[in-house]
Amino acid sequence: MLYQIHTAPLARKAEIDLPASKSLSNRALILKALSGGRGSLSHLSDSDDTHVMQAAFDGDHTLVDIGAAGTSMRFLTAYYASTPGAEVTLTGSERMKQRPIAILVDALRSLGADIRYTEAEGFPPLHICGKQLRGGALTIDGSTSSQYISALLMIAPTLTDGLTLHLTGQITSRPYIDMTLSMMRRFGAQCAMEGPVITVSPRAYVPADLSVESDWSAASYWYELLALCHYGKVASGLQDGALNEAASVLQDKVFSKTSGSQDFALSEVTLLGLHPDSLQGDSRVSEYFAELGIATRFTDRGAVLSATDQPLPTEVCWNLAGQPDLAQTLIVTCCALDVRFRISGLHTLRIKETDRITALQTELRRLGFVVGAEGDDVMYWNGERCESQCPVVISTYHDHRMALAFAPMALCLHHDALYVDDPGVVSKSYPSYWDHLRQIGLSVSEAKL
């Protein structure tokens, strides 16, 4: 399926009922299961990832297919391995079978787990025979996926000897580890983190009632939309194939400001269910976009975003090691706003739903932006441009965040449509996204080329 997105007169103000956080939802489901299935969870995410997790706990299964849900693969691997009597084969999509899991499996085996690979060594599918694990001390590379670490932490109270986890090197996505520990405490766990050492005592979880807050990752696309409405450039297209070598000449001849146009009247967005004291690391999106002219204030209903008149920076330098899921949003936004950037902390992007570094470079080139990369950790843009494609068709690579981050670029194509391939991929985290874009006035419809 292909969607075409056209600019249209937009609402001046919008109120968006964001999806619940899938990061919090998935942790809550695991912790509820480890608590004996008791307690009440409300406002769970409606995402594919969370549905997969719920289905895994719905009855007895000998085969669990988690599709493209990486979080579910990591969390359920640890859960089943530590559940006496469980016997299950855990599999997923073809892409999932290419995503490494050896670090987690090796760690669980060192704790006594019975896990074997059924196809390629080091990758799903996995055959797991659950048993009581002994626990003890474990050392793991802190720069690995935080989901491995969170998976181990959540089962730690059920281990005979608890768990002392030593993290070596740079710790990746620390906010997600903090989120996991905080939620474990809500379910009665005794855990502490001092420097690179996390200690979890053996102690039975207790049931908890929990309402999941809205998703800050989903909020990032509304920051992007508002920034593009207020500051973005509207491209007339390079249909004649002529290339402007100087960025200033290109900006004058090819781009015009959107601000003030009736087609781009969106000036305030209220995002329901967001809190300033969030457990989610991606809540820092408000700080990043404050540098890009978008202010945030909080009411008892959520976050209210509004555009300011502050000048945009010529260049930004950010480290997203704690918020890698914001990379696509921020990189696409900076290109659209003509803000040069150097962004580090991206070393987990190549093993996400797709190789996000390569995917970003490829799709931004379709829009006329030449973005560089240094190894697996850094992406940068120095203002270099190339001939854009017409029409612009964005490939999503089975990655929800590619569709979510690139769709707002429709605001930057003047009267031309932006096309998004496989738009249904957004159901992985934000199923109502296209309806919400229509709600503010964008034209989103099926198309054929």
Show which residues each predicted segment covers.
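Short, structured segments at the rim of ligand-binding sites
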Residues: 1-449
